Structures are given as structure tokens and as C-alpha cells.
């Protein structure tokens, strides 16, 4: 299952201008098929950012809804084998402009979604903090992030759960000078803890976008780090004790490249995907494969070498 957004003309949602609606496509084994998704009443725009499936009849997709009142809300949809259905989330007075970016499920009754929320510290001060939600098969509940008391802004963009009680989430933390650095939290049992990440040497800016955990003691996260005005792919590996930065390949001729997603079916078999630019501003897709020893570029349609 793949999710995202699709721009639609003005009549959709009753809006006066073009906007986004959720996009859901399913691979049947031979082709991609479009599926109909639903949104809450009063929606102006909506998009999906992450999806995970515990079985062929149990999938969860998460994203963001913009209401006609101008307020953003998180969007969660469930696939029961026949249709996508919206599940309403609990409201929180302390949470403004929330967004969900990714979700991980270990069973139909155990899913965790991550993103960010904005909360007010006073009349003129607000901060961005991690948003973590837990699904128990009946309803969503808020889980406190380990970083809620930190005055530095943090958000989570990717999550992987190698077991029901253990999840790793990655994202970024804004520093005092305005730059960002890799940020990660781990759920071990019932509580979340901040993990010490690895900062790439010689860079003022870096973020992690996604993570995959092929085992309890092995996780790989991807993102980017800044090199002058350009971006370079960032790959970090966790061995159960700490995070380390590992060499990441860039496409030949790339002036800027970023890895945005990763999936692993074994500790020695992972595939990461992202985008790159060369001399023109046009973006191309690219992918890289991990064989247990090194990362190598994998040619793909519409990617490396394509116009």
C-alpha cells in the first residue's frame, strides 16, 4: 500500500480553489490500483503521509486534515479488507496544528503513530514538540514524549516497531542557533526515552526522516545533512548500544541528494529511497541497497539517468 496526496480541482470538498485529497494505491501483484479514501466532515484539504499493514485486511494510514475553519487536525484511516474508514482522535486543548508523518503496527491492535504538535507556553511563545499516538484496536490515546519538557523544538518523522513493546522513532531537534540535528526516541515498555544520536562531522544541519528495524538490536535511519548550500544523504545505524554514521552513496553527478524512506526485511537486506538534483532544479528519484556490508546505488525508472 502506498499513500500520499493528489491535487484536485475546486469543486472537491466544496472549496473555491484547488486543493489536496488523500491518495491511496494498492499493489495487486501485477499493477497498482487506486482505492477510495474517506475524510471527516468539514474537510478543506487532506493528505496521507505514512501507512503500515499488520495483515492484508488490517492497514493504518496517517496524515493531516485542514478544516474549513482553518484548523489542522490529524487524520487516521483504517483498512478492514473492504474499505477505508476514518477514526476520530481525542482532542487536546494543549495541542495546536498537529500532524502525523508515520505509523508502525505489530498487530491489528498495536500501532504507534508519530509526528509533531504545537503547544503554547505563553501569550507570545509556542514550541513544536513530538506527537505520539497509540492504537489498541479500539481507540487512539496520547503517549507523552520523553522530550516534552525540553525548550528546544523537536519533531518525529519516522517510526519502526520491532516488537509490541519496543519502538524507535527518529526526527530532528532545533538548536539554539536555528540549525537542526538528528533526534531519536525509544519506547521500551510503557515509557519513551531520548536516545543519543550521532551528529555528522563538519555539518551545521542534519535531519532524520525514516527508520527501519530488522531486529530488536538493529535499526537504520535515513535523512540528510547540509554541505554548504546543498544536501547530502545521511544514513545512521543503531547496534543496540549507540548510533553511528555510515557512508551513504549519492547518485553520479548529483549536486544535492536526500534519503526520505527505508525498508528492511533482514539485517543484511535494506532498500532506501529518496530524491536528488544535478545541474538543473528538476528532482529525480533514486534508491540505494544495503547488502550487510556496503550501500550501493540501484537504478530505477524515472530516476538516475532519466530526464
Predicted regions and their residues:
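Residue-level hotspots at or immediately adjacent to binding/recognition sites across diverse folds
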Residues: 1-307
